Amino acid sequence: MPRRRKIAKRIVPGDPIHNSIHVQMLINKVMMHGKKSVAENIVYRALDVAAQRLNREPVDLFEQVLRNSSPTIEVRPKRVGGSTYQVPVEVKSDRRIALAIRWLLTAARGRSGKPMHERLALELVDAFNNTGATVKRREEVHRMAEANRAFSHYARF
């Protein structure tokens, strides 16, 4: 247990165009080497392309993508006696969104051949339609949790 005071959670302000905290989190994750304007350009272009393909508002589309790709349950290692069990635990809401954004970017960066805004737009469209690598990753995490359901009685953190 930490002996120092609890560190206050950093509050992320909304992005300049849509005033959405989640879009700003995506921009911050896309950003490399402190180049925020480049990251904003990538994210806004990707949201516009995806929104155009699906005839939706960009922020509504992104919120739906986060709902489709965020995990509700995951496994955490818990050492009991001499062995380590993978214990399924519920994911807190902040971590859900962070994982969904991280997986979305990993999947978009894993695609090849196109500029980043197009790869991100394609991944957004796939996640909106409940297909693609991001949703597959969520299903994989849920499968792991379901397979280790027998150890759920250890989940007393």
From Swiss-Prot:
Q: What Gene3D superfamilies is this protein classified in?
A: Ribosomal protein S7 domain
Q: Which GO terms describe its cellular component?
A: small ribosomal subunit
Transmembrane intervals? none
Is Ribosomal protein found in the keyword set?
yes
- What InterPro entries is this protein classified in? Ribosomal_uS7 (IPR000235), Ribosomal_uS7_bac/org-type (IPR005717), Ribosomal_uS7_dom (IPR023798), Ribosomal_uS7_dom_sf (IPR036823)
Q: Which UniProt keywords apply?
A: Ribonucleoprotein, Ribosomal protein, RNA-binding, rRNA-binding, tRNA-binding
**Top-rank taxon, per record:** Bacteria
Q: From the UniProt record, which GO molecular function terms apply?
A: rRNA binding; structural constituent of ribosome; tRNA binding
Q: Name one Pfam family in it.
A: Ribosomal_S7
UniProt keyword annotation of Ribosomal protein present: yes
GO biological process terms, semicolon-separated: translation
Q: What does this protein do?
A: One of the primary rRNA binding proteins, it binds directly to 16S rRNA where it nucleates assembly of the head domain of the 30S subunit. Is located at the subunit interface close to the decoding center, probably blocks exit of the E-site tRNA.
Q: Which NCBIfam families match?
A: rpsG_bact
Give the family per the record.
Answer: Belongs to the universal ribosomal protein uS7 family.
User: Oligomeric state and partners?
Assistant: Part of the 30S ribosomal subunit. Contacts proteins S9 and S11.
Protein name per UniProt: Small ribosomal subunit protein uS7
Question: What organism is recorded for this protein?
Answer: Herpetosiphon aurantiacus (strain ATCC 23779 / DSM 785 / 114-95)
Q: What is the lineage of its organism?
A: Bacteria, Bacillati, Chloroflexota, Chloroflexia, Herpetosiphonales
Q: Give the gene name.
A: rpsG
